[in-house]
Every structure is written in C-alpha cells, then in structure tokens.
C-alpha cells in the first residue's frame, strides 16, 4: 500500500513537472512575441512623437477643444482627476490589505507607482515642451515635460491591473462585475482625450504613453501570474503529500 502511494505521488509530481515545462515553453514564446510587438510599437510611437510637426499637434488640439457642450470641461477634469498616483494607490492598497489581498496589493503598487516613476524619469530624459497658452487653451500648466504622459502611463498600469484583478476575482454572475470592468476600461480609454482637451499634452504624446504603460502592465501581470502559479504548485504538492499519509 505504501509503495502504491509513493508511485502515485511520484506520478503526480512528474505530471506537474511536465505541465510546468510545457506551460513555461508556451508562456516564454508568448512573452517573447508580446515583448517584441510592444517594443516595435514603442519605437514607432517614439518616432511619431519626434517626427510629427508642431503644426499638426496644434491643429489636433484645437480641433478637440472646439468641441463644446455643457459639462464637458468638468467631465474631462473628472476623468483626469485620478492622476495623483501616490494617493490613489495608497487608498486602494489599504482596501486590498483589509480584504487580505496582500499579493494583489503588492503588484498593484508595483504596476501603478512603477509605471508612474518610469514615466517621470523619461520626462526628464526627453524634456519635451508642453502645450502653451499662446497656441492652445491650457487649463493647468505643469512644470514637467510633455512626453510621456504620466497620467496615461499611470492609468494604463493602475486601472489596467485593477481591471485584471476585478475580472479574475469578482464572481461571473455579480451585477457589479460588468459595471466595474466597463468603468475601468472607459477611464483608460478617455484619459488620453482628456489630456488633449485640457491642453496638457500633444496628440503625438499619446501613442507612446499608452504603449509604455501597456509594456509595464504586461511585465507586472506576468510576474504576478508566475508568483501565483508557483504558490499554487506548492499548495498542490503539499496537499498531495498530506493526502497519501
């Protein structure tokens, strides 16, 4: 009986190891392809930022700012209102910790604040000029550079990770699940338009900012899944050993 249990345990262990190798092979290939696509997109976006003439950026901003109806300015300010990265992340992390979601809290912090920090460093590197009030309407003048947009990068990394957590953790039949997912997706989609409308960034800043955020979000999600997978495998082996005692 003991020998049979040992054989079954060894078979399960070998099966887990095989599945792990197969999963890593597929996962590694997908990771390389995704990283290459994002890198190519980022290079293209950087070229767009460097080569697009100022006249085009000014015309695009004025076209967006020509749209006017009651409440639009307030709505755009609301969309951009979650851009204070440290405060927003701290509040959410406290909520996740209270729900015993320590792993999610850690990676949300790494994704949100990490993306924001990277964007701030790149701003100093590129030192590109922001829109000025002599050519477009500027609702608030920031002292930092225009590219990349810290708001865009933060929104993609932070709300993108929250989207992943909500999709994974909220029950499929919950009435709040679609509402939460749509809200997060809309915030990510509209923040670029809001920054353009408020005269905070040029149109050429947006593609690279979205792609930079997508790259860092992908890295954080990949690490999160690897950590979660390792913990699940350890738990499976522990339960298997306990079951054969």
Tell where the protein language model's regions lie, with residue ranges.
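N-terminal transmembrane-helix/juxtamembrane module of multi-pass inner/ER membrane proteins
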Residues: 2-87, 124-142
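Membrane-interface helix-loop-helix junctions at transmembrane boundaries of multi-pass membrane enzymes
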Residues: 20-29, 99-108, 174-178
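Interfacial segments of alpha-helical transmembrane regions
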Residues: 31-38, 92-117
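Alpha-helical transmembrane segments of multi-pass membrane proteins, especially transporters
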Residues: 62, 107-112, 206-210
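Hydrophobic alpha-helical transmembrane segments
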Residues: 80-100, 156-160, 166
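Hydrophobic alpha-helical transmembrane segments of polytopic
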Residues: 88, 92, 112, 180-187
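Membrane-embedded catalytic cores of phosphoryl/pyrophosphoryl-handling enzymes
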Residues: 135-245
């Amino acid at each position: 009986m003991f020998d049979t249990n040992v054989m079954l345990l060894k078979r399960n262990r070998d099966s887990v190891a095989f599945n792990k190798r197969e999963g890593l092979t597929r996962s590694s290939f997908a990771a390389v392809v995704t990283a290459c696509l994002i890198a190519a997109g980022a290079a293209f976006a950087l070229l767009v930022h460097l080569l697009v003439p100022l006249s085009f950026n000014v015309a695009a901003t004025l076209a967006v700012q020509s749209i006017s109806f009651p409440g639009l300015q307030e709505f755009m300010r609301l969309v951009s209102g979650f851009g204070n990265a440290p405060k927003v992340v701290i509040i959410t992390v406290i909520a996740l910790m209270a729900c015993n979601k320590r792993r999610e809290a850690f990676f949300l912090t790494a994704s949100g604040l990490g993306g924001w920090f990277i964007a701030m460093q790149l701003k100093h590197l590129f030192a590109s000029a922001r829109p000025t009030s002599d050519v477009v309407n500027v609702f608030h003048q920031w002292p930092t550079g225009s590219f990349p947009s810290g708001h865009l990068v933060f929104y993609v990394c932070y709300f993108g990770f929250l989207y992943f957590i909500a999709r994974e953790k909220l029950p499929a039949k919950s009435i709040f699940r679609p509402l939460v997912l749509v809200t997060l997706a809309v915030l990510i989609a509209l923040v670029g338009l809001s920054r353009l409308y408020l005269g905070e960034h040029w149109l050429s800043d947006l593609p690279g900012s979205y792609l930079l955020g997508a790259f860092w979000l992908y890295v954080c999600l990949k690490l999160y899944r690897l950590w979660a997978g390792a913990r699940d495998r350890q738990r499976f082996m522990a339960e298997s050993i306990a079951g054969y005692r």
